[in-house]
């Protein structure tokens, strides 16, 4: 079946427009539970995550790291199952690991190795031939901005440089999935912005999908299109941030002067939901209704709109609501 449409047939010209194709599931969880002895860490997680960049959020002890380690096959589920790119974590973990690049939260360097030797070694461990691993190591270190320092020993690196070296070793073999565990942890504001820019660049390149594990809401909000919030081993909330941002633009709050029942009735006839208190109105815009329509109705009825605000539910709002449950 063709994935394009043609226009301009009457003029003899053809314009091909690609149709949007949804991404295949990246991570599928089906009743996934993990237990160490009598201690239950993950409790019946069920979700299908398709985003290009997925954020894992939760307070310390929520189960984020356990979930990552389980998806990589380091922990075995006590119940349920999970798939990554369609591969079962119980029986096809080798295939999963071959597709993943992992940037751990904690350092795992050999301090007397140079950065280029370390990244080359990690490339070889990921299956690259030595000559290709060396070439890719240079490329990865240039990409993250460590070209001039690539022959220095890792033990001489600053915290920010070590984070960049960890990113380089995670991408050296060209994985399909990049797992980032607290990538901006301990970075100063300028180094954080640099890291965020690189994560966005990788995401927008569309060659790798990303799972970002962080306790910093701003990092997730800046880089992710889906968020899974964990609390005490359970899924507290799932949010598609793109949909949340679009939904925010449909919620309005007006401060008016001279508003009356006729104005409210006219808005409701457009299919909008309204709630009126004193000189304030809250409404949900119907599909196809724009703010200019509200201004037009106000002008026709001599109603002055003093202030108009869109609702702005931030990720912090979503997270705090999830933690209340």
What name fits each language-model region?
Residues 59-63:
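Walker A (P-loop) phosphate-binding loop of ABC-type ATPase nucleotide-binding domains
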